[in-house]
């Protein structure tokens, strides 16, 4: 296994270009399954483990792809399978994104239930509700979702989401573009990732109204085509890099980053005392002498994102006072807190709220990653901790951050990847 070894205490400053968004890449890659001819060319696709896993899934279905210099080419002309097997789906919950496209194109899809909990804190029931509303019959047996469209064709419908769901909204969009008639989605997710998926589907020939809002209207079509498309930047990676500069007292400029997609996060950095300067495609952060404590509540977009919650907790350990971080999306997403406290943080957990007492002087030590954003949080802590911090199990980090140690070194961090044996 790999670990990151960090010598803390160095201010990080410099200029970086933001990577393409992983959370946008996955649904637009899935959407290529909707069309069976031509070649898709997708620019600004990050070279990540999750992208590789998704490509393996497409290859299993019969697609061909290549990724070079962040440009992904995909041909789905030879897709001849409707089966997404457990061996691939278990690696990544986002594999559920193939359900809608396969069902819409072939009238039948058989997709393994994602690994972990099928109906727990991150349920798939909304995805199944969407397909049933569009006229599919759903059965679950032997660990697989078996979805069959009546008479081989989905039908447009009105779908109201009881709670906002990016994944279910994405699957609804992809299924609806090939359905007969009109589909309306209310209380749909409005995240930039959904906006970008809409723009990709429109480029393919779909008709979608209300893009960027929580009410979407999709006119079904039978004619889509392959396209060349530019992916958007990764707003969570960008927020993490801004936090890396802020927690170490440095300054950073991110290029090819749209501040419109980060209003809630940039507002909180400003409240913490950081100076924020933006252009239409860049963000600059200058750190204050002392960070101020700032409460945040993670909720669906346009509110503060749950995927920045862990990083904000790390940042607030260095703020002069007490802050409260509440997560209303995933109530138990606090696995990083015991590890932060091992480094000297003072954090209490009360239900879905973390109370962070700053300023705390962190001391380096070994810490264990438990998930993607927890890994980023621990790296941030290591950057400011005194001495050496070892972040173990960084395969979690590799799922969502492209060349993270190289980028941090560019800013002045002392960080290197080493192999270790886990017993």
From Swiss-Prot:
Pfam families: EPSP_synthase. Keywords: Cell cycle, Cell division, Cell shape, Cell wall biogenesis/degradation, Cytoplasm, Peptidoglycan synthesis, Pyruvate, Transferase. CDD domains: UdpNAET. GO terms for cellular component: cytoplasm. Its EC number is 2.5.1.7. InterPro entries: Enolpyruvate_Tfrase_dom, Enolpyruvate_Tfrase_sf, MurA_subfamily, RNA3'P_cycl/enolpyr_Trfase_a/b, UDP_GlcNAc_COvinyl_MurA. Phosphoenolpyruvate binds at residues 22-23. The modification 2-(S-cysteinyl)pyruvic acid O-phosphothioketal is found at residue 117. Pathway: Cell wall biogenesis; peptidoglycan biosynthesis. UDP-N-acetyl-alpha-D-glucosamine binds at residues 93, 122-126, 307, 329. The active site is at 117 (proton donor). It catalyses: phosphoenolpyruvate + UDP-N-acetyl-alpha-D-glucosamine = UDP-N-acetyl-3-O-(1-carboxyvinyl)-alpha-D-glucosamine + phosphate. Signal peptide: none annotated. GO terms for molecular function: UDP-N-acetylglucosamine 1-carboxyvinyltransferase activity. SUPFAM superfamilies: EPT/RTPC-like. It is found in: Cytoplasm. The keyword Transferase applies. The keyword Cell division applies. GO terms for biological process: cell division; cell wall organization; peptidoglycan biosynthetic process; regulation of cell shape; UDP-N-acetylgalactosamine biosynthetic process. Cell wall formation. Adds enolpyruvyl to UDP-N-acetylglucosamine. HAMAP family: MurA. Belongs to the EPSP synthase family. MurA subfamily. This is UDP-N-acetylglucosamine 1-carboxyvinyltransferase. It comes from Chlorobium chlorochromatii (strain CaD3). The gene is murA.
């Amino acid at each position: 296994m790999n670990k990151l070894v960090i010598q803390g205490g160095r201010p990080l400053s410099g200029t970086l270009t933001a990577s393409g968004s992983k959370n946008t890449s996955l649904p637009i890659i899935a959407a290529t399954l909707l069309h069976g001819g031509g070649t898709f060319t997708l620019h600004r696709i990050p070279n990540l483990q999750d992208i590789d896993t998704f490509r393996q899934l497409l290859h299993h279905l019969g697609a061909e792809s290549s990724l070079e210099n962040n440009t992904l080419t995909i041909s789905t002309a030879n897709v001849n399978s409707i089966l997404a097997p457990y061996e691939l789906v278990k690696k990544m919950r986002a594999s559920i994104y193939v359900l809608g496209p396969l069902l819409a194109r072939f009238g039948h899809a058989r997709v393994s239930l994602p690994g972990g909990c099928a109906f727990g804190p991150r349920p798939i029931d909304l995805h199944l509700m969407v397909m049933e509303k569009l006229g599919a019959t759903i059965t679950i047996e032997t660990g697989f979702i078996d979805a069959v469209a009546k008479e081989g064709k989905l039908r447009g419908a009105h779908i109201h989401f009881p709670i906002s769901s990016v994944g279910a909204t994405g699957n609804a969009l992809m299924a609806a573009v090939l359905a007969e008639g009109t589909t309306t989605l209310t209380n749909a997710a409005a995240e930039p990732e959904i906006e970008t998926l809409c723009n990709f589907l429109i480029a393919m020939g779909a008709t979608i109204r209300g893009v960027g809002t929580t009410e979407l209207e999709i006119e079904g079509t039978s004619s889509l085509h392959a396209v060349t498309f530019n992916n958007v930047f990764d707003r969570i990676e960008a927020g993490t890099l801004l936090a890396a500069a802020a927690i170490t007292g440095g300054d950073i400029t991110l290029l090819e980053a749209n501040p419109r997609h980060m209003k809630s996060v940039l507002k909180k950095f400003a409240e913490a005392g950081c100076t924020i300067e933006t252009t239409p495609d860049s963000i600059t952060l200058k750190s204050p002498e002392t960070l101020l404590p700032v409460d945040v509540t993670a909720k669906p977009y346009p509110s503060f994102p749950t995927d920045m919650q862990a990083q904000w907790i790390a940042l607030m350990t260095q703020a002069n006072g007490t802050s409260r971080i509440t997560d209303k999306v995933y109530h138990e997403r606090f696995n990083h807190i015991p590890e932060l406290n091992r480094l000297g943080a003072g954090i209490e957990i009360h239900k879905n709220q973390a109370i962070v007492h700053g300023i705390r002087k962190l001391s380096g030590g070994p810490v264990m990653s438990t998930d993607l954003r927890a890994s980023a949080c621990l790296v941030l802590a290591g950057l400011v901790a005194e001495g050496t911090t070892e972040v173990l199990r960084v395969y979690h980090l590799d799922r969502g951050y492209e060349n993270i140690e190289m980028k941090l070194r560019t800013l002045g961090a002392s960080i290197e990847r080493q192999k270790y044996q886990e017993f």
